[in-house]
Swiss-Prot record:
Keyword annotations of the record: Cardiotoxin, Cytolysis, Disulfide bond, Membrane, Secreted, Signal, Target cell membrane, Target membrane, Toxin
Name of the protein this chain belongs to: Cytotoxin 1d/1e
Subunit architecture: Monomer in solution; Homodimer and oligomer in the presence of negatively charged lipids forming a pore with a size ranging between 20 and 30 Angstroms.
An annotated GO cellular component: membrane
SS bond partners: C24-C42, C35-C59, C63-C74, C75-C80
Organism: Naja atra (Chinese cobra)
CDD domains named in the record: TFP_snake_toxin
Superkingdom, taxonomy of origin: Eukaryota
Main location: secreted
Example of a GO biological process term: killing of cells of another organism
Length: 81
């Protein structure tokens, strides 16, 4: 009975991912990446000339301000970019 209880506790910890980490999409290769500590936002960067295709994706700590040439879209859930 103790073994079963211990097994359930371990499975619960693994499933809950107590040290929650954010996963963001990358552009190259097209896959998700686990963000390092402190980088708690995902972002997409677009050139203002073509807002349909992102030119860069990844993890970031603070969402940059848009400029005349570049637009950033930031979010804070897994693979939201």
């Amino acid at each position: 009975m103790k073994t079963l209880l211990l097994t359930l506790v371990v499975v619960t910890i693994v499933c809950l991912d107590l040290g929650y980490t954010l996963k963001c999409n990358q552009l190259i290769p097209i896959a998700s990446k686990t963000c390092p500590a402190g980088k708690n936002l995902c972002y997409k960067m677009f050139m203002m000339s073509d807002l349909t295709i992102p030119v860069k994706r990844g993890c970031i700590d603070v969402c940059p301000k848009n400029s005349l040439l570049v637009k950033y879209v930031c979010c804070n859930t897994d693979r939201c970019n």
